[in-house]
């Protein structure tokens, strides 16, 4: 199957309920209500910095798509919304545009429609493993130039690669290749997962290399489940996907994992479905959060701006009801953890 057909499959399957697996454990986090917040709702200030760049909220549009006509239209709409709301935007994996230059436009629409907000380029770890140093440097520069990126993300998707019919489960040497990416980019380097989470052990290995870690935790869109749905001609891949679609570290736990071993910028993603979930992520220790599936679905339904406005209103309300005037104050609000998250923190000896 061609890579362009695969990209469109991913769009439709990711926007469906079939792709939604498990819980990110945000129900395990209760922010304590402040009945006397001593602030007005109008005083709540969402502005913050994304890896040094000023943005209007600690929330961005996560990595989704690119490479097909449908993806190009979606990326244009996402970029327009990012520009309107003053929030960062990731693009989906740019590999397809590097091997098929005729589809570069499906990514270039992002810089055309969002010239003033931080944009994040995106390449996959398996491509790092297979490329030589010079070719990798060229890919990094091209990916950044394609969207005028402020930062570059390298996504870790080992579980997806194992079950994908066209998968490339090659990860040997990726850590050293990340150093090449960082040097070639001359931009902030984000290392992100895609739905299975990042542990404290991996976070520790990324210290000094990654400028940011995006946890990409379990409990939302499962690319393992998506690849299982695509694997109609491969019983083995379908069986593997069915077995491993529940594999991973729930997002709330992954935030605590990374926070315990990594002092850099921490981005939460994976199963965040409201501004309240995002507020909980920040209270747990994240500096920023992104959402993908709800925004993809909203874009396909023609209600993207309404969805973003609702997420921002939910986040602002959470801050008001906890007495947090700023994002920095939100990180300090009192909270209570449910038994699953509390047990995880204790067994893994985490700070959260």
UniProtKB/Swiss-Prot annotation:
Chief place of localization: cytoplasm
Which species does this protein come from?
A: Pyrobaculum aerophilum (strain ATCC 51768 / DSM 7523 / JCM 9630 / CIP 104966 / NBRC 100827 / IM2)
Q: In this UniProt entry, which cysteines form S-S bonds?
A: none
Q: What is its EC number?
A: 5.3.3.2
Q: Does the keyword Repeat apply?
A: no
The family this protein is said to belong to? Belongs to the IPP isomerase type 2 family.
What is the organism lineage in this UniProt record?
Archaea, Thermoproteota, Thermoprotei, Thermoproteales, Thermoproteaceae
- Please list the residues that bind Mg(2+): 161
Query: What is the name of the gene encoding this protein?
Result: fni
| Protein name, entry field | Isopentenyl-diphosphate delta-isomerase
Keywords, comma-separated and alphabetical: Cytoplasm, Flavoprotein, FMN, Isomerase, Isoprene biosynthesis, Magnesium, Metal-binding, NADP
Q: Give residues annotated as binding FMN.
A: 63-65, 93, 122, 192, 221, 271-273, 292-293
Q: Which GO terms describe its molecular function?
A: FMN binding; isopentenyl-diphosphate delta-isomerase activity; magnesium ion binding; NADPH binding; oxidoreductase activity
Q: What does this protein do?
A: Involved in the biosynthesis of isoprenoids. Catalyzes the 1,3-allylic rearrangement of the homoallylic substrate isopentenyl (IPP) to its allylic isomer, dimethylallyl diphosphate (DMAPP).
Which CDD domains does this UniProt record tie to the protein? IDI-2_FMN (cd02811)
